[in-house]
Amino acid sequence: MLIQFSKMHGLGNDFVVVDGVTQKVFFNAETLKRLGDRHFGIGFDQLLLVEPPYDPDLDFHYRIFNADGSEVQQCGNGARCFARFVRLKGLTNKDRIAVSTVSGRIVLQLEDNDQVTVNMGVPEFEPAKIPFRALKAEKLYLLRVAEQTVMCGVVSMGNPHCVIEVPSVKDAPVETLGPKLESFDRFPERINVGFMEVVSASEINLRVYERGAGETLACGTGACAAVVVGIQQEKLKGRVKVNLPGGSLYISWNGPGSPVYMTGPAEHVFDGQIEL
């Protein structure tokens, strides 16, 4: 079966985006691994699938798959690319696009200059809903991982995140501590790990080790999680600039019960077709 796809990226976090509205597609884990291979396939951090809406009040359903074949609940950089894709392909003429994901609903707003603002929803701190094994919600947790003590904030942005403050992201133990925390037994569904350097109350540097993908050039939900944790711990406030290896995002959050807003770019690279 021949399928059409687009290659896109948000700050270097790269995606294969597939229209599942006008073409019939089905991906199993084996196919996803083959397509995700950067030497023998197309290569991507995630594959994004556009599906018809499950609810008449929504415009589309948004599914996200990692290159290891696993399906994930949320991807902020992918959401921005999703919004640009459905407009570029004529699947909608709206600037405000409401979609469902595995973890809930999000709203995408197309701005000028290829920027997209995403209402990422309300962050979840309740351990059982993250999921995270803890007696109660705390602003800061102490974890004993691989014979070292780690202080971190834990939150779900539709997917689970652990955020650690570091003196410098340049020297952060992303490749060593990242995978150990990702599979730590107190995170039953594994976790994304953010290493945050606070520059000022309105700016941070961030590196993210993503669950199922390793370190990526940018992680939208990771940026949201880091800002939420920083605001909760009174280290950040207002609109925060998040500097990632691939570029910068702007994150806003007004506190508990409020949604997180993320603004950043979405770039279309090329279109192609491949035999499944």
UniProtKB/Swiss-Prot annotation:
Keyword Amino-acid biosynthesis carried by entry: yes
Site residues by UniProt (Could be important to modulate the pK values of the two catalytic cysteine residues): 161, 210
EC number(s) from the headed UniProt entry: 5.1.1.7
Catalytic reaction(s) noted: (2S,6S)-2,6-diaminopimelate = meso-2,6-diaminopimelate
Active site, per annotation: 75, 219
GO cellular component term of the entry, any: cytosol
One Gene Ontology term of the molecular function aspect: diaminopimelate epimerase activity
Binding-site positions, substrate: 13, 46, 66, 76-77, 159, 192, 210-211, 220-221
Subcellular location: Cytoplasm
InterPro entries from the UniProt entry: DAP_epimerase_AS (IPR018510), DAP_epimerase_DapF (IPR001653)
Keyword Amino-acid biosynthesis: yes
Keyword set, alphabetical order: Amino-acid biosynthesis, Cytoplasm, Isomerase, Lysine biosynthesis
Residues under site feature: Important for dimerization: 270
Pfam families noted in UniProt: DAP_epimerase
Pathway stated in the Swiss-Prot or TrEMBL entry: Amino-acid biosynthesis; L-lysine biosynthesis via DAP pathway; DL-2,6-diaminopimelate from LL-2,6-diaminopimelate: step 1/1
Subunit structure: Homodimer.
HAMAP family to which the protein is assigned, alphabetical: DAP_epimerase
Function as written in the Swiss-Prot or TrEMBL entry: Catalyzes the stereoinversion of LL-2,6-diaminopimelate (L,L-DAP) to meso-diaminopimelate (meso-DAP), a precursor of L-lysine and an essential component of the bacterial peptidoglycan.
Family classification: Belongs to the diaminopimelate epimerase family.
Annotated protein name in UniProt: Diaminopimelate epimerase
Protein's organism: Tolumonas auensis (strain DSM 9187 / NBRC 110442 / TA 4)
